[in-house]
UniProtKB/Swiss-Prot annotation:
<comment type="function">
    <text>Involved in transcription antitermination. Required for transcription of ribosomal RNA (rRNA) genes. Binds specifically to the boxA antiterminator sequence of the ribosomal RNA (rrn) operons.</text>
</comment>
<keyword id="KW-0804">Transcription</keyword>
<dbReference type="Pfam" id="PF01029">
    <property type="entry name" value="NusB"/>
</dbReference>
<comment type="similarity">
    <text>Belongs to the NusB family.</text>
</comment>
<keyword id="KW-0805">Transcription regulation</keyword>
<protein>
    <recommendedName>
        <fullName>Transcription antitermination protein NusB</fullName>
    </recommendedName>
</protein>
<dbReference type="GO" id="GO:0005829">
    <property type="term" value="C:cytosol"/>
</dbReference>
<keyword id="KW-0889">Transcription antitermination</keyword>
<keyword id="KW-0694">RNA-binding</keyword>
<dbReference type="InterPro" id="IPR011605">
    <property type="entry name" value="NusB_fam"/>
</dbReference>
<dbReference type="GO" id="GO:0003723">
    <property type="term" value="F:RNA binding"/>
</dbReference>
<dbReference type="InterPro" id="IPR006027">
    <property type="entry name" value="NusB_RsmB_TIM44"/>
</dbReference>
<dbReference type="GO" id="GO:0006353">
    <property type="term" value="P:DNA-templated transcription termination"/>
</dbReference>
<dbReference type="GO" id="GO:0031564">
    <property type="term" value="P:transcription antitermination"/>
</dbReference>
<dbReference type="InterPro" id="IPR035926">
    <property type="entry name" value="NusB-like_sf"/>
</dbReference>
Amino acid sequence: MSRKESRTQAFQTLFQLEMKNSDLTIEEAISFIKDDNPDLEFEFISWLVTGVKDHEVVLDEKIQPHLKDWTLARLLKSDRIILRMSTFEMLHSSTPQKVIINEAVELAKQFSDDDHYKFINGVLSNIE
């Protein structure tokens, strides 16, 4: 399956982990999707989910300066996860920033409120 579908599953896994207040391990959360989606890139999903969880503080420090008059705590959980996930990928992969931002916008259109994709696009476009 595509990277796009794998990013969607990584997003859903991170959302699930945040909803469960980390009672679930990353491996347990990923195992829930393995049975239903054997063709996904689980190595990529695991790398992305683990990277976001392990680097949350650093990612938040990178994102926060670009949230004009907002704090990460005030954002929707979905927006916060999309920003962290995309920032991690921009900092730690060779995938072009444009591709990562486009995927983030698509995730926001699917999982966030109506116009939040514009906000996601604006924040990520300013992260280096």
